[in-house]
Structures are given as C-alpha cells and as structure tokens.
UniProtKB/Swiss-Prot annotation:
Phosphorylated at Thr-220 by STK11/LKB1 in complex with STE20-related adapter-alpha (STRADA) pseudo kinase and CAB39. Autophosphorylation is also possible at Thr-220. The modification Phosphothreonine is found at T220. This is NUAK family SNF1-like kinase 2. Residues 57-315 form the Protein kinase domain. It catalyses: L-seryl-[protein] + ATP = O-phospho-L-seryl-[protein] + ADP + H(+); L-threonyl-[protein] + ATP = O-phospho-L-threonyl-[protein] + ADP + H(+). The modification N-acetylmethionine is found at M1. Belongs to the protein kinase superfamily. CAMK Ser/Thr protein kinase family. SNF1 subfamily.
Length: 639
C-alpha cells in the first residue's frame, strides 16, 4: 500500500519566492502525488486492489453536468442513495486544474458539519470514497434528494420569515464552521445550497474554496457576479471571510424578499450598484433589514462578520440557543442554555444598529431570555437607544480610509453617515403604513431636482435562470472552458496592505490583471494552451509537457454511460476526520476556471469591443457573460 502524507504547515510563513517555486513545481504523479494544500496532517492512500463501479453501484439519472464531467445519482448495494461525480482527465487542461481538484477533495473530506455536503463514508471506518484510474477521477458524495434552494424558492410565492430564518441559521452555522477552520467558500449562491430529505441545508461545491490567513490578502476574483462583493467586482485584494459575508447578505435578502438586491441590466450598472451598496429597497420592509444592511456594507471593515451574524437577535429569535452556542455544543463545549447577561451585553455592543430599528422586539427578546426579565437589569429598555457599537463609533475614520466609498463632504450633512447608496426607508403615509410603490425601488439621488429613473417592477423570481440551463449544485461553479472567459485568476497571498494599482496611461503600457474578467493574459486559457498539456495520462504519471494533439472525435462522442464502464479504479482513502483539530492554512493556488458558453451568432463577444483605457475591470465589459444573460433573460420576459 502506498501512502503519501501531507506536509505540516511550517511555524513561519514561507517567503514569496518559496511560494512561487513551490507552485511552479512540475506535476508528474497524478492526483496521488499532486501538490497539496497545507492542511492538517493526514494521508492519501492507494489500495492495490481494484474496484469495478458497475458492480458496486447502480447508476440512475444524471443530476448535473460540468466542463470536467457529470454527476450521477446512484444506489449502492445497501440501498443508500449517493451522488457520484466523475471528472474526465482529458478535460483537465493544466497543472493548476488538477491542483484545484485536489484541494476541493481534501477540503470537503476534512469538513465535518451537518449542513455541509459530505464525501461518502464507508461503514464506520470513515474512509473517503474517491476513485481514480488512468482516465477518470470519481468522487462519491452525499445525496441531497430535495434539490437546491433555487428550485425550492421558485416553487413558492414567498418564504415566511420563520422559514427564511430556519434556512439562514443553518447556512450561517455551516459557514461559521468553515471560517473557524480557516476556510472561505467564495461561491455562495442558491444553486450551491442543497436540501436533504428532511429539508435541511447542505452547502455544496467547494470548487472555489480556499484557506486564508489573517493579515494576508487573496487576489482571486471569482464567483457569480450577482453575489460578488465590492472587493471582487473592483479587483481589490481581500482576506476572505468578508466576501462570504457579502454573499450571505445577498442570500438573506433573497430568502426574505424573494428577489435579488442588485438588478443591473448590464455589467456596468451592476458593478456601480454593488460598489455603492445601492440595493433595491423592498416595498415591505422586514425585521431583517438591519442585518441585511450590515452584511451589505461596502466597507469590508464595517461589514458584519460571521460571529456578528451568529449572535444577531434576528437570527436567534425564537430559539433558546444561539448559532454560536450550537457550534460550541457540537464541539463538546458547555455553554449556557440561554443568553446570559455577559453574552447579551456583548451582543448589544455589536448589534446597536439593528437594535435602534427594532427596539420593541429586542426588549421583549431580552425579557424572554434573561432570568428575571427587565426587573433584574434596570434601564436596559432604553439602553439600546443610547449605546453605539465600536463599528459605528469608528464610522467616520473608516469612511475616510476606505477607497470603495464616497467620502466627499457635502454641505449640511454630518461626517457620520451611512455609506453611499445605502437606501433609506420610504416615507410613510398618513395612516402610518409604508407606501408600496413598485416604481420607487431605486436609490433617491443626492442632487436635488435630479429625476429618479423609472424602473419596471421585476418579478419576484426574476433572478432565477431557466431550469434546463442550470447546473446542479454539485457542479455549479464556473469551470475551465476554451472560450477564454475567466471568472477567476490566480490566488496570491500579499502580506500587509495591498498595493494600490495605478490606472493605465494612454501610452499603451501593458495592463495587469484587475477585476473579474481578463483578456488573454498570462493566466488566461488561451495563453496556457500553447505551454501546457491538453490531456493527462495515467494515474501515476501525467502526459508529457509538450502540447498534445486534440482527439479526433469530439467530447460529445463519449458515451453517456462511460462512468459505467468495466474499467478498474484505484480507491483513494483519507483517514478519519478530526473535528477537534483546527485546519491548517495553506498556500493558495491558481483558480483557472472559466464560464463555458457556446459562441452565439450575431452577438459580439466582449473582448471584441474596444477596451480603451480600461484596466480589464468588470466595468469595461460591454457585453454580459452567459451566466448573467441567462439570469436576466427570464427577468426581462416576465416583466
């Protein structure tokens, strides 16, 4: 039996040159000996005996397809249903792709949470079922029988606040667990949130996930534009958790209001809305509006963290145990059953803005959960109107230091103000009810007399793409394609403050990577095709580094039942998960994933337009990507 152990993270961070040399090391040993993320020490083992998948599983329908392969529903001999993801090696274009797959497998196999999709375990030995042969990598995963949250919301007029809170708490619990273990997901969206047979959340697709370090920055611009944070769309380095917090705010808005917060009809409008935090003010405000506003803060230093969300009053309303306390209980801690005075005071300090907007319910919540109610703590009924959080006290300083927000002084306005584009509540009618005007869904312009652009009311489910064009949550992340469209480039760790990028001059200097999309750069697919192999060989040795000729038959000629072939597979085992041991950080790698789209006649590709003086930012794209056009297609038809 061959065993390859993962290296422990060194006590001191390696230098940038060491990281570069490590990432550039030739890959020649397949998935078993590919470069590995530096996580907790564990081993990847290969058995000498072979496995025939046809004898082991009964394959049923296809759940989803991606660039690398497909996901099939299958039934094992015990009767248990599983989801089997097959990855064809001839679809893996370069070393970074294989490294990316390796990282996804090891991150998923290391996580152990009830609301995260699990790689299937065999019996009580907790062996991860991953198979590999000369042409395929096969991953056996947990099957979520009720589809994804996208379909669940589509089938219902609107979720009740109770149901929205139920789903949101489970999402927060899983994401909080990831952040505690140093993992950032970076692709949170409805399609990647599955539901099991009991209607519980299962977060899937860790294809764009990575490990992060405090004090260091990532520079991978990835994920869906509709869920992307201002740092992502503007090409700014980020630590990691703050981009998940933004996506969490978008998800909460969808769960509560049934539509997308940002509805730009093109990329420039969308980026402007996201950069200003100008989300659509709902006609019927919810009690969750304060938390949504906190999560959709443009300044990442003022944005709510997962700890803030886990202890927020709206998330824990009606529950005797907070989300953070549930995590402590699951890890073997002994927290109190209810919020005590100390935790309540800490919660008050971090949640002053929601308290100001929902004072009555907060006082009721405090009396309900603190022994003795308001009688034991005098003056707390008015405490929420007097106390300010540290985030709010530092608002003016943060605004001055944040380039993502408009800090220009305006006459007659205080220096302590909300970020530009954060919508104010609509004026009430004489009866005290909020006026529901579908035309007044845009932010009110700051300049007096400036007309408000008329916007037609989008349907509640305008965010949803056609079901036949969507991919499964097991395979929904953008994956490499030959179109040259990339939604993410390489991960780079930057110590200290990010270096400010200067705008290009008109002299035609070389433009560097910035923003979501990039044209034919050193990280683009077209640049890699001439220097990297197009296919991989056997399990233990990949093909030569010289470019290989394309196969004579198209990929579509591969049989639909190719996964059911009589080929023998080697089983790769990962040992038992150790939830009590924190995951170790790792050097991030290049994420070379693109959005596959067939060329359409009569529609000019975005890179055919004149880029002018752009920096390859998302704002320079004259045409939307395929995913965004599909997302808005049904919106325009139904409106």
């Amino acid at each position: 039996m061959e065993s390859v152990a993962l290296l422990q993270r060194p006590s001191q961070a390696p230098s940038a040159s060491a990281l570069a040399s490590e990432s550039a090391r030739p890959l020649a040993d397949g998935l078993i000996k590919s470069p590995k993320p530096l996580m907790k020490k564990q081993a990847v083992k290969r058995h000498h005996h072979k496995h025939n998948l046809r004898h082991r599983y009964e394959f049923l329908e296809t759940l989803g397809k991606g660039t690398y392969g497909k996901v099939k529903k299958a039934r094992e001999s015990s009767g248990r249903l599983v989801a089997i993801k097959s990855i064809r090696k001839d679809k893996i274009k370069d070393e970074q792709d294989l490294l990316h797959i390796r990282r996804e497998i090891e991150i998923m196999s290391s996580l152990n949470h009830p609301h995260i999709i699990a790689i299937h375990e065999v019996g009580r030995s907790r062996l991860v079922t991953v198979f590999e042969n000369s042409s395929k990598i096969v991953i056996v995963m947990e099957y979520a029988s009720r589809g994804d949250l996208y379909d669940y919301i589509s089938e219902r007029p609107r979720l009740s606040e109770r149901d929205a809170r139920h789903f949101f708490r489970q999402i927060v619990s899983a994401l909080h667990y990831c952040h505690q273990n140093g993992i950032v997901h970076r692709d949170l969206k409805l399609e990647n949130i599955l539901l099991d047979a009991n209607g519980n959340i299962k977060i899937a697709d860790f294809g764009l996930s990575n490990l992060y370090h405090k004090g260091k920055f990532l520079q991978t611009f990835c994920g869906s534009p509709l869920y992307a944070s201002p740092e992502i769309v503007n090409g700014k380095p980020y630590v990691g958790p703050e981009v998940d917090s933004w996506s969490l705010g978008v998800l909460l808005y969808i769960l509560v209001h049934g539509t997308m917060p940002f509805d730009g009809q093109d990329h420039k409008t969308l980026v402007k809305q996201i950069s200003n935090g100008a989300y659509r003010e709902p006609p019927k405000p919810s009690d969750a509006c304060g938390l949504i506003r906190w999560l959709l803060m443009v300044n990442p230093t003022r944005r709510a963290t997962l700890e803030d969300v886990a202890s927020h009053w709206w998330v824990n309303w009606g529950y005797t145990t907070g989300v953070g306390e549930q995590e402590a209980l699951r890890e073997g801690g002994h927290p109190s059953g209810d919020f005590g005075r100390a935790s309540m005071a800490d919660w008050l300090r971090r949640s002053s803005r929601p308290l100001l907007e929902n004072g009555a319910k907060v006082c009721s919540f405090f009396k309900q959960h603190v022994p003795g109610g308001g009688s034991t703590v005098p003056g707390l009924e008015r405490q929420h109107s007097l106390k300010k959080s540290r985030k709010e006290n530092d608002m003016a300083q943060n605004l001055q230091g944040d380039p993502a927000e408009d800090t220009s002084s305006r006459p007659g306005k205080s220096s302590l103000k909300l970020p530009k584009g954060i919508l104010k509540k609509k004026s009430s009618t004489s009866s005290g009810e909020v006026q529901e005007d579908p035309q007044e869904l845009r932010p009110v312009p700051d300049t007096p007399g400036q007309p408000v652009p008329a916007v037609s009311l989008l349907p509640r489910k305008g965010i949803l793409k056609k079901s036949r064009q969507r991919e499964s949550g097991y395979y929904s992340s953008p994956e490499p394609s030959e179109s040259g469209e990339l939604l993410d480039a390489s991960d780079v760790f930057v110590s200290g403050d990010p270096v400010e990028q200067k705008s290009p001059q008109a002299s035609g200097l070389l433009l560097h990577r910035k923003g979501i999309l990039k044209l034919n750069g050193k990280f683009s697919r077209t640049a890699l095709e001439g220097t990297t192999p197009s296919t991989f060989g056997s399990l233990d040795q990949l093909a030569s580094s010289h470019p290989a000729a394309r196969p004579s038959r198209p990929s579509g000629a591969v049989s639909e039942d190719s996964i059911l072939s009589s080929e023998s597979f080697d089983q790769l085992d990962l040992p038992e998960r150790l939830p009590e041991t924190p995951l170790r950080g790792c050097v991030s790698v290049d994420n070379l994933r693109g959005l596959e789209q067939p060329p359409s006649e009569g529609l000019k590709r975005w890179w055919q337009e004149s880029l002018g003086d752009s920096c390859f930012s998302l704002t320079d794209c004259q045409e939307v990507t395929a995913a965004y056009r599909q997302a808005l297609g049904i919106c325009s038809k139904l409106s």
